[in-house]
Structure formats: C-alpha cells, structure tokens
C-alpha cells in the first residue's frame, strides 16, 4: 500500500466551555469535549436507545482557535474535521498514560459552527461560520517515487 489516511469527521455538541491555554511561546491552544450520540430502536422491546460518545478535541490552528474563542460555548453544535493522535504522558505517580485526541492543525482541518447564535446577529440557527485552510495541490507528483513496502 502506497499511503494511508488519518481523518476524523464529527458532528456533535460541545460538552463544556472550551478550555483555552497559552504555551510558553504565547501560542493559544484549545481543548474541548465533543459529544456524538447514536440512537436506535431495540429490536426486542421496540424501545428507543441511545449511546453518547465523548471525544477530546485539541485545536492548534490559530484561525480556528480565534473562531472557537469568539463563538463556541457549552452546547454549541460543531462539524469538525481533523486527525487522530495518541500521546503518552506520566501521571503524578509516574505511571504511563495514553490519551487519544482529535487534533485540528493548520492543515487538513475544518470547523463549522452549525448553530451559531450571536446576540449581535439575527442568525436564528440558519447561518454558520466556516473557517477552512486552502488545500495545496501538487500537480507534478511522480508516482514512481512511492515506496510500496510495508513499514513493519
């Protein structure tokens, strides 16, 4: 196989107000929790069932950070595109822990506010704000340079 794909697309609701942090270099990073809910009808009881999955989202893109800072609060409905990343860290007792997050970088990431309600605008849930970095295309890509070997 010549390539792979790491892409996550989610539509869900923000579980709490986004957490904004600033790095030592002054760069802002946002952490938020996004809930997606599946619903189905139980075959035996005909009862409506649902299951909510919580996703950790980390936003590094300066443009997306700016939009989230201004418009996103607990309950906001978002469409996001990003990639999955797992990071390793040590807790206070020195034990290794792993966290998998949906990461929005400066490239291949998108965020759309699906139900933006701003008191200064009369959107009534019909408008949305979108911020997307333009994708670059390399029209002179040479497929003969691809390494077809399995990496393990």
Curated annotation (Swiss-Prot):
Q: Does the keyword Cell wall biogenesis/degradation apply?
A: no
GO BP field: DNA recombination; DNA repair; DNA replication
* Known role: Plays an important role in DNA replication, recombination and repair. Binds to ssDNA and to an array of partner proteins to recruit them to their sites of action during DNA metabolism.
One Pfam family of this chain: SSB
User: One Gene Ontology cellular component annotation?
Assistant: nucleoid
DNA-binding region, as residue ranges, is located at 54-60
Which keywords belong to this entry? DNA damage, DNA recombination, DNA repair, DNA replication, DNA-binding
Q: Which residues form the SSB domain?
A: 5-111
UniProt biased composition (Basic and acidic residues): 127-144
| Description of how the protein assembles with itself and partners | Homotetramer.
In terms of PANTHER family, this protein maps to: SINGLE-STRANDED DNA-BINDING PROTEIN
Spans annotated as Disordered: 118-152
Q: Which InterPro entries match?
A: NA-bd_OB-fold, Primosome_PriB/ssb, ssDNA-bd
GO molecular function annotations of the record: single-stranded DNA binding
- Chain location of the short sequence motif Important for interaction with partner proteins per the record: 147-152
Q: Looking at the record's lineage, which domain of life comes first? A: Bacteria
> Which named protein is this?
Single-stranded DNA-binding protein
């Amino acid at each position: 196989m010549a390539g792979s794909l790491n892409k996550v697309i989610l539509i869900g609701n923000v579980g709490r107000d986004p957490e904004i942090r600033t790095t030592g270099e002054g760069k802002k990073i946002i952490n938020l929790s996004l809930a997606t809910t599946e619903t189905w009808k139980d075959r035996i009881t005909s009862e409506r069932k649902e299951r909510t999955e919580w996703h950790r989202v980390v936003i590094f893109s300066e443009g997306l950070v700016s939009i989230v800072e201004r418009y996103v609060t607990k309950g906001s409905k978002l469409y996001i595109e990003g990639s999955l990343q797992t990071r390793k860290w040590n807790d206070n007792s020195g034990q290794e822990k792993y966290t998998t997050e949906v990461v929005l970088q400066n490239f291949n990431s998108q965020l759309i506010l699906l139900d933006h309600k701003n008191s200064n605008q009369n959107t009534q849930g019909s408008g949305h704000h979108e911020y997307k970095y333009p994708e670059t295309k390399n029209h002179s890509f040479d497929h003969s340079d691809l390494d077809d070997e399995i990496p393990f």
